[in-house]
Amino acid sequence: MRPILIGVAGGTGSGKTTVANNVLEQVGTEHIAYIPHDAYYRDLSHLKPDMRAKVNFDHPDSLESELLVEHLKQLRMGRAVEIPVYDFTTHTRTDETERVEPAPVVLVEGILVFVEPELREIFDIKLYIDTDADVRFIRRLMRDIRQRGRSVEAVCEQYLSTVRPMHLEFVEPSKRYADVIIPEGGFNEVAIEMVAARIRGMLEERAE
């Protein structure tokens, strides 16, 4: 059975991961393979640490999306893939990989998954999580400080220099490609339940 490929996009801190986790919970983790686009950031080990921090991580070129497309094609053919494991504190790929087995549903989440045409067009369902900019910034600030060892000053500087401009140039315009736009992210239980019900229905149809 050909898997259902789902893309979940939206600005940084919009609630993409929360929505993805809620869908996973409602549909059943045994039915879904989850892949974060963040895992495909390009390895910057060839750069000095101070130069790595200056890279624009919110530009499509910072991600190896062509590798993700290849992995999705492999999963669609029923083959397992080894996805990269990225270290956000050093901005490098580790020597480890994470094995993702084929599943009836493959869910990919990331801010730029609708920007590259080849990646965007591979999805059967495209969801865009739409959340106010101030809420997204606060969430990103808290995440980067707690999980990625960043300072308040560094997060604010990055937000103003690259995150916000790239959101306006790439992320926000990609919303027009979405099949469903979900306001307020993980707090929109009705929308999440509707999406989960649709996925369950598609799985039942394909099982017949």
Language model: regions and residue ranges:
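Conserved lysine of the Walker
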Residues: K16
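Post-Walker A helix-loop "phosphate-sensing" segment adjacent to the P-loop in P-loop NTPases
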Residues: E25-A33
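Conserved nucleotide-sensing/catalytic segment adjacent to the nucleotide-binding pocket
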Residues: A33, R42-T90
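Phosphate-binding/switch loop-helix module in NTP-utilizing enzymes
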Residues: H71-V108, V113-F114, R200, R206
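ATP-dependent NMP and nucleoside kinases share a basic, alpha-helical "lid"
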Residues: T94-R148
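NTP-dependent small-molecule kinase module
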Residues: E101-P102, M142-I145, R164-E208
